[in-house]
Amino acid sequence: MILFIVPIFIFLGLYFFQEKLIFKPTKLAENYKFQFDEKFEEINILVDKKVILNGVIFRSEAKKGIVLSFHGNKGNLSEIGKRSSLFTENGYDVLYMNYRGYGKSSGTIKSESQLLKDAQIVYDSLKKEYKESQIILFGISIGIGVATYLAAHNNPHSLILTATYSSFKKVLKEKLPFVPGFIWKYELNTNKRLQKVNCPISIFHGKEDLVFSFKHAQTLKENHPRIHLFGFEKYGHTNFLESNIFKKRIIVELNRNSIQK
């Protein structure tokens, strides 16, 4: 009897508290002052009653367009924002947004639909200043599911995915095969949503990735041949983001799909 009851309690715990397993936010005090080498603006976007998402935007002189970046399941903008020069030095503004509960953003993530709805509100706010044809979506790790959703439901200039998965639920099932699939509420089905994406798509993935296997990137490429896939030898989950080879390659992709004003 105990052997039957214990798994039930474990599965119930995973179902109702899986956000704590998936999302690992680092909170920052409301009066925290970001410090970056580049000039930036701190912004706050109201996404729900009393819920504000905090972000930082870096602006370039050329103003070719803007990169809207969605980060992974850990950290906050105090670290992520340090990558801004990769885009600004090549003529693109970049906006880094925190999800609910991350950094100085209020609220908590409670569902996939809520996560994606918030992202759409952020995207819509950018449309007040930029044409959709000037918006580049950039996703890192779990953020690639958010970026892909927006690309599938809007008309951005292009979509750049780093450290990808074909379906987040599939990753969870790979990591915890003993847990029934219906327990997982966060599907984030990248493979399915890419079918509705019309803009250019680029994928960057470390071949030694132990979090999301490189096979996920290969699956996406096989199912969507027009994707430009770049695999990095001897790199893991996201450490290639700091490498010169990645920086050079992404500049090539940005120029290949250069925005026409």
Where do the PLM segments sit?
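An N-terminal hydrophobic leader/cap segment in hydrolases
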Residues: 2-46
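Membrane-embedded segments
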Residues: 48-125
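Alpha/beta-hydrolase fold nucleophile elbow
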Residues: 130-141
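Hydrolase active-site cap/lid region
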Residues: 144-199
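Short beta-strand/loop motif that positions the catalytic acidic residue
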Residues: 197, 203-205, 209
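Conserved alpha/beta-hydrolase "acid-adjacent" motif
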Residues: 210-216
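Catalytic histidine-centered segment of alpha/beta-hydrolase-like enzymes
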Residues: 235-245
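Catalytic active-site module of serine/aspartate enzymes centered on a nucleophile-bearing elbow/loop
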Residues: 244-261
